[in-house]
Amino acid sequence: PMSHPTNTVVVSAPPLPGFTTTLFVQADPDEYAVVAPLMDVSGVGVVYTQNSTSRPWHHAAGPAQATLRRSADRNVLLDAGQYAGKNRRMAQVGIDESWVRFQQRDLGLPWAMADSGYCARGDLPGVETILRSCGKTSGNVIAPLPVSKYLLIEDADKVRDLIEKQDRPVALIVEDGADPFGARGVAAGLVHLLAGGAPIGLLRADTSALGALAFGAPFAAIGTRPGLRHIPMKG
């Protein structure tokens, strides 16, 4: 879990416009029946996650629509999950704008999340591709950055510069075999990104999500199971 570095100012940010919470649960679409009552009681949001690169969009659409019907709050995000698995997409491929439009027009979500591919160690061009592609979309769009933990350890300055050159909120998703924030330098890298003031959330996390919120993230999500608390290593 992410610990607070010493001598830092802890600030919390308001939710993104259209949301009423900063804390989300990251869940499989099949977990709707478990997650929905939790949302009713606690007011948290949900990130429905497609964990197969072969599953069609509508797999998560049903639970998303059911959640929107159930609650006056619209704290729902869809994570396409294209960055994970044996056949995962890489960042340089770009994004599918029809997936963005599907979330906006068909589902009426307050925020659409692009279906970004994975950014490997040192893949700053991949980060740039995702941010540039998301910048060309219209409406409320979050740019997911699914990254190797080494991009936070080794290239936090450069990643922060790229994020601050564009105007989309960013959702950071970090790869590791277990807990990425257990590795030296990862938490410091995230805090460095958040210190820039750009809206950066953390998805697929454990209690590190609470640390991210304390340091100014406008949204963060805790996974319902270990595989949804980080990007599993490929294999």
Annotate each language-model stretch with its function.
Residues 175, 179, 201-202:
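Glycine- and other small-residue-rich loops at beta-strand/loop junctions that grip anionic moieties
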Residues 40-44, 108-109, 166-170, 189, ...:
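Glycine-enriched alpha-helix->loop->beta-strand junction motifs that scaffold or abut catalytic
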Residues 182-190:
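N-terminal active-site wall of soluble small-molecule enzyme domains
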Residues 43-54, 111-112, 203-234:
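Glycine-rich phosphate-binding active-site loops on the catalytic face of alpha/beta enzymes
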Residues 23-25, 199-202:
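Short catalytic-loop micro-motif centered on adjacent basic/acidic residues
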Residues 180-181, 207:
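Extended alpha-helical scaffolds
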